[in-house]
From Swiss-Prot:
Entry protein name: Small ribosomal subunit protein uS4
Lineage of origin: Bacteria, Bacillati, Actinomycetota, Actinomycetes, Mycobacteriales
Domain S4 RNA-binding: 91-157
Keywords: Ribonucleoprotein, Ribosomal protein, RNA-binding, rRNA-binding
Entry function: One of the primary rRNA binding proteins, it binds directly to 16S rRNA where it nucleates assembly of the body of the 30S subunit.
UniProt cross-references to PANTHER family, sorted A to Z: 30S 40S RIBOSOMAL PROTEIN, SMALL RIBOSOMAL SUBUNIT PROTEIN US4M
Family assignment from sequence similarity: Belongs to the universal ribosomal protein uS4 family.
GO biological process, one term: ribosomal small subunit biogenesis
Subunit structure: Part of the 30S ribosomal subunit. Contacts protein S5. The interaction surface between S4 and S5 is involved in control of translational fidelity.
Example of a GO MF term: rRNA binding
Biological source species: Rhodococcus erythropolis (strain PR4 / NBRC 100887)
A Gene Ontology term for the protein's cellular component: small ribosomal subunit
Length: 201
């Protein structure tokens, strides 16, 4: 299954959650798209679980196959499966770039990574799904600092709260990974237990 590259607002409306953050089109019409979008739908337990899984997938921009692999890994780790899953998703490099404020959306962050603008521990990494570890140092390549996205990032970094597990050195746009996040540090409206229930059937 190919990655969804269509209008994200349409997915936001279908799942009834702002997948982008600050999506004015969603705020104007926060109901499902289509002729019968405002009609009430009987929400079964399965539908709620499916919607929660889809919210997570589209929020982080992950395909179903990859998401299922993340779930299996989370399930095999000690601790709560749902929290493990969110920790895995949050530790993706594209998400870290977004969380640090170097990109306005996760889609833009993915693009910055794939275009080879970033170094992790002084090594070029252009894979959005690359997973950061505690004490990793993420830098913008020297020649990339003069490009428009990073000029904008320099001016706007700090406008959005940075989670406590990350630190951004504004002038250099350096990201320090102090730790991997705890559930309380993941500011996202997801009921991860519903995702666990979906895959447990």
């Amino acid at each position: 299954m190919a990655r969804y590259t269509g209008p994200i607002t349409r997915k936001s409306r279908r799942l009834r959650v702002d997948l982008v953050g600050g999506d004015q089109a969603f705020e104007r019409r926060p109901y499902p798209p289509g002729q019968h979008g405002r009609a009430r739908i009987k929400e079964s337990e399965y539908l709620l679980q499916l919607q929660e899984k889809q919210k997570a997938r589209f929020t982080y921009g992950v395909m179903e196959k990859q998401f299922r692999l993340y779930y299996k890994e989370a399930n095999n780790r000690p601790g709560k499966t749902g929290e493990n899953l969110l920790r895995i998703l949050e530790s993706r490099l594209d998400n870290v770039v977004y969380r640090a404020g170097l990109a306005r959306t996760r889609r833009q962050a993915r693009q910055l990574v794939t275009h080879g603008h970033l170094l992790v521990n002084n090594k070029k990494v252009d894979i959005p799904s690359y997973r950061v570890s505690q004490y990793d140092i993420i830098d913008v390549k020297e020649k990339s600092l003069s490009t428009l996205p990073f000029q904008v990032a320099r001016e706007t970094v700090g406008d959005r709260p940075v989670p406590g597990w990350l630190q951004v050195v504004g002038s250099r746009l350096r990201i320090l990974v102090h730790q991997l996040p705890e559930r309380a540090q993941i500011d996202i409206a997801l009921q991860e237990q519903l995702i666990v229930e979906y895959y447990s059937k």
